[in-house]
From Swiss-Prot:
Organism for this UniProt entry: Arthroderma benhamiae (strain ATCC MYA-4681 / CBS 112371)
Leader sequence residues: 1-17
Protein family (similarity comment): Belongs to the peptidase S10 family.
Cellular component terms (Gene Ontology): fungal-type vacuole
Alphabetized GO MF terms: serine-type carboxypeptidase activity
Disulfide bond entries: C179-C419, C313-C327, C337-C360, C344-C353, C382-C389
Glycosylation sites: N210, N509
Protein name: Carboxypeptidase Y homolog A
One GO term of the biological process aspect: proteolysis
Top-level division of the source organism's lineage: Eukaryota
Functional note: Vacuolar carboxypeptidase involved in degradation of small peptides. Digests preferentially peptides containing an aliphatic or hydrophobic residue in P1' position, as well as methionine, leucine or phenylalanine in P1 position of ester substrate.
Top-level enzyme category: hydrolase
Amino acid sequence: MKFLTTGLLATAALAAAQEQQVLQAEDGHGQAPQRDASIFDETLQKFQSSLEDGISHFWSEMKTNFKDYLPLISLPKKHTRRPDSEWDHVVRGADIESVWVQGADGEKRREIDGKLHNYDLRVKAVDPSKLGVDPGVKQYSGYLDDNDADKHLFYWFFESRNDPKNDPVVLWLNGGPGCSSLTGLFLELGPATIDKNLKVVSNPYSWNSNASVIFLDQPVNVGFSYSGSSVSDTVAAGKDVYALLTLFFKQFPEYASQDFHISGESYAGHYIPVFAAEILSHKNTNINLKSALIGNGLTDPLTQYPQYRPMACGEGGYPAVLDQGTCRSMDNSLERCLSLIETCYSSESAWVCVPAAMYCNSAILAPYQQTGMNPYDVRTKCEDMASLCYPQLNAITEWLNQESVMQALGVEVQSYESCNSGINRDFLFHGDWMKPYHRLVPSVLEKIPVLIYAGDADFICNWLGNLAWTDALEWPGHKKFAEAKLEDLKIVNNKDKGKKIGQVKSSGNFTFMRIFGAGHMVPLNQPEASLEFFNRWLGGEWH
């Protein structure tokens, strides 16, 4: 079995062969597509001979148990592309790439850096009255098209409720990999949610209360996005995000002049260091990146995986979920897990990073999964595994699949799903899961502040692990940050002034927050507290 998360599709038991069930991709008739087993065998044999014995063993297990179930790429979505004439705006990346200006030194240079000629951006002005989502607030939806690779990323933009001419712009990314950011929109921090009767309910604590927010379905084939190809690693996805922002701000220069922040949760702990580094690598850009925020992220597996046992066994501030025997078993498995992750860090090759993910997720994550407790909140049982332990997702999915909704948004796929297991599988089997993307954070910290926040009831990307990797990160401010003490985080902006909502430590450009009483999705469990620290962060506090 494997458990799906709104932020992390933890393939928790891929290596536990006897008890596993792998979610199979189906063709249009409900049958698993045929695989070319001979090619699969030859590929594994070619590389197995050069691997260490332990790693080779895991590839042998995968070859035996999973070759008939795992496609090498996720299947494309059925879609119908709308003609450009049906869109309110179409921005051509080639037009942007062709603009040259003269610098102060007299030399000619491109106005905006980056490979953009293959990208277009299609924009639809959404009529809020048709959907009932934040009536009166300006909204846009559409697609970023990579015409060379046949990739089409869906986005939905909400202007700030407060002062859109001056408020910052924020990009929100859910994780997975393979989960739609519309989950974040309707379940967590967006302007509305959907009740069990499919009625739109306003969210007074939406993050667009004082900021304009872009919700992006990425990588391709997630949510309303689609493609004839696939993206199976974080670095490739970063190029698409840079193009989206560049073309969006070119179409809407009124937002380009404002501060921009990139935010997300869970597997976005992989995405955001890469995406921020990609943006910052361009000297001439129209993206005014000011900070990055990661909530309950997976960023440094080598440092975070040792904290799963303490969190599950009563050392994270909540009662133990696992018995002492299971806790000892996790301890006994940890050394081998960390050895595999270290090898992955050294090589960054899929042929060693995949076995690390398979073994560690089976030995370290699966014991918790088998209890039936919610992996995103140690306080509760998992109500419905099919809906990722949150039945509210069923109503959100049903609402988004209505023809009237898809028509209003300009959607080009036939259906919406909150998470795509095929994308998760692609990233896993390309070795992305265990790669050391935290190594990019120091270079990001040189230029912008970074906030790592964590709901303290989450298991899957728990606060202990996030505190551990931020304390361990090697950067010029490492010593001062590691020595800084956690201090009370209190509400300062409303009637609950003085109420403790968590703990915070900060030094230089780096800040860590523990949010009390929140699981994996902080804005869902603590909406008031999340908007409090979000607004204060955007306002410049702690940096």
